[in-house]
């Protein structure tokens, strides 16, 4: 079912690719005094891609506590199907990790599959 909606979800053309971190989560964001952003670490998956790719991890771990997704969307906006794209990106990332490691972590994969189902139902 997910692939049947792929063309709808990714129908909005990406204006331009930008350099993304590829694994942007709260553990890879450096914050200094006064809560100022000082840098990013662990850029092993950096690439030029859709700028929204990095957003899928903003709600992982403790990201929701820091309102990262909401802050980003307020400052930069989001595509029409951003939530559905993020569900795809999150699921793809876990499949990619599985391919690289051979380890499937149900604790991570199950919520991603459920989220994908919820996002598809919104279409």
Model-derived features with residue positions:
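Hydrophobic alpha-helical segments that form the core
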Residues: 86-96
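C-terminal, non-catalytic tails of nucleotide-sugar-dependent glycosyltransferases
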Residues: 12, 81-82, 118-123
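Alpha-helical structural elements of signaling/regulatory helical domains
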Residues: 12, 64, 78-81, 103-108
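An alpha-helical support segment within catalytic cores of ATP-dependent transferases
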Residues: 1-22, 32-33, 115-116
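Hydrophobic residues in alpha-helical segments
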Residues: 10, 59, 99-102
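Active-site Asp-x-Gly
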Residues: 17-20, 25-84
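A structural signal for well-ordered alpha-helical scaffolds and beta->alpha junctions
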Residues: 3, 65-69, 88, 109, ...
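ATP/Mg2+ or Mg2+-diphosphate-binding catalytic cores
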Residues: 74, 97-123
């Amino acid at each position: 079912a997910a692939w049947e909606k792929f063309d709808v979800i990714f129908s909005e053309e990406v204006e331009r690719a930008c350099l993304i971190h590829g694994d942007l989560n709260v553990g890879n964001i450096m914050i200094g005094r006064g809560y100022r952003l000082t840098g990013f670490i662990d850029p092993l998956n950096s690439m030029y891609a859709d700028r929204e790719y990095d957003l899928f991890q903003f709600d992982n771990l403790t990201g929701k506590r820091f309102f990262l997704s909401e802050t980003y969307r307020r400052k930069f906006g989001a595509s029409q199907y951003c939530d559905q794209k993020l569900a795809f990106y999150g699921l793809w990332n876990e499949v990619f990790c599985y391919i690289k490691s051979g380890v499937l972590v149900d604790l991570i994969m199950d919520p991603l599959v459920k989220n994908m189902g919820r996002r598809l139902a919104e279409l």
